[in-house]
Amino acid sequence: MSVSMDHRVLALAGVAQALQQVRRIAETGHSEAATVRTAMDSVFRVDAASPEAVYGSAAALAPGLRLLHNYFRNQGQDEVLPRLALAVLQLERRFVRDTSTVATVASGIDAAARQAQQLGDSSHPDVLSSLGGLYAQTISHLRPKVMVQGNPHYLGQAGVVAEIRALLLAAVRSAVLWRQMGGNLWDFLFAKRAMIEAVDRALR
């Protein structure tokens, strides 16, 4: 299979991995620090030379790749996650066609990147707040709206909401990369076997 399919599944794993954290935070109020950092780093690495470089390494995407592995074999335990992923992949189309929103997001990411550099942590709460606010002011106004359900106790906390929105921004970033690598929703119908093989290669 072509390298492009290998690259596509890495980007798709980035989408799944970020959204898994969204689901986790919404339900429990807690996230996995290393996974969140991988997601935030991917937002800032806009000029990376390869999909692997966007996430630091293919190994950093192991949780997302396992999610894809289970999904393709009908072993996924979270029925909501695929629906969230589909909404994000559809939202990406609206986003990239809205040049004004793209420019605003790019400027906001640049500002947040400087903030992260000053703080020495891409997943610092202040950085998450900045990126979450950026998502709320821009992409969240596009359709389809990504609806996140969870425990009302946690969804009422500003820090939790900011982290969820920052991760949704990261998911959209991965969706953009997926499309840049040639990804298309038709892949799920007509290239499923190739996707499964690419996921298996990435997990070896």
From Swiss-Prot:
<protein>
    <recommendedName>
        <fullName>High frequency lysogenization protein HflD homolog</fullName>
    </recommendedName>
</protein>
<keyword id="KW-0997">Cell inner membrane</keyword>
<comment type="similarity">
    <text>Belongs to the HflD family.</text>
</comment>
<dbReference type="GO" id="GO:0005886">
    <property type="term" value="C:plasma membrane"/>
</dbReference>
<dbReference type="GO" id="GO:0005737">
    <property type="term" value="C:cytoplasm"/>
</dbReference>
<keyword id="KW-0963">Cytoplasm</keyword>
<dbReference type="InterPro" id="IPR035932">
    <property type="entry name" value="HflD-like_sf"/>
</dbReference>
<dbReference type="InterPro" id="IPR007451">
    <property type="entry name" value="HflD"/>
</dbReference>
<keyword id="KW-1003">Cell membrane</keyword>
<dbReference type="Pfam" id="PF04356">
    <property type="entry name" value="DUF489"/>
</dbReference>
<keyword id="KW-0472">Membrane</keyword>
